[in-house]
Amino acid sequence: MKIRKSLLAFAFVLLGFGATQAQDCETDYSLYREYIKQWEQAKYNPSNMNPQMVVSWRNIFLNCPDFRQNTYLDGVKIMAYGFIRTTKDEALKEKYIDTLVMIYDKRAEYFPMGKNGSQVGNIMGRKGVDLIKWAPNRYEEAYTALKQAIDMDGNNANYGFIDSYFSVVITMVKNGKLEESAILDEYDRLSEIVDYNIKVNTETANEKIIRQLQYNKS
């Protein structure tokens, strides 16, 4: 009987802890979201970044990973514009970039599905584009991420990834990481994706996307 009472008491403690944690998540989320809106209005100026925003965001990221997808969208902005862009210390910048990569990977882990199905390919593509932008020396990681995006989504791949992927394929060849034949192979594959999307968007009269696709192909 005493054992049963002890187990029951322990269960209530756990339930209480879960409720407290959920409340903490809500509080931190509301707090950092308010600060990030203000920061957005300041055009992500690092000097206008409130330290409490980072503290509250970090608490959500570490302790409430499946609470809101916005945690990861906002995390990319915080790391890229608040830290990576302004840091002169290369060793420290690498750590910030590692965190940026982790944010993308965690988003894919906890929020793999979007409105139209799997969004993992799109998340990996965005990771690859950011790696090219902020850490061009990490081109192999960028290649892996962008290739995953193209492989997973095929004709439905974000057309914004096409240029970045082909560019990093060329970089891989120049550095002896891929055979020269990869350039022609991937050009053919990407051209098929572009042609498919031009056809689809011509039928739906989406001129803006058509112009971008034609630019990518040129």
Residue ranges and their predicted role:
Residues 1-26, 76:
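Bacterial Sec-dependent N-terminal signal peptides
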Residues 23-218:
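Preference for long, solvent-exposed alpha-helical segments and helix-linker "stalks"
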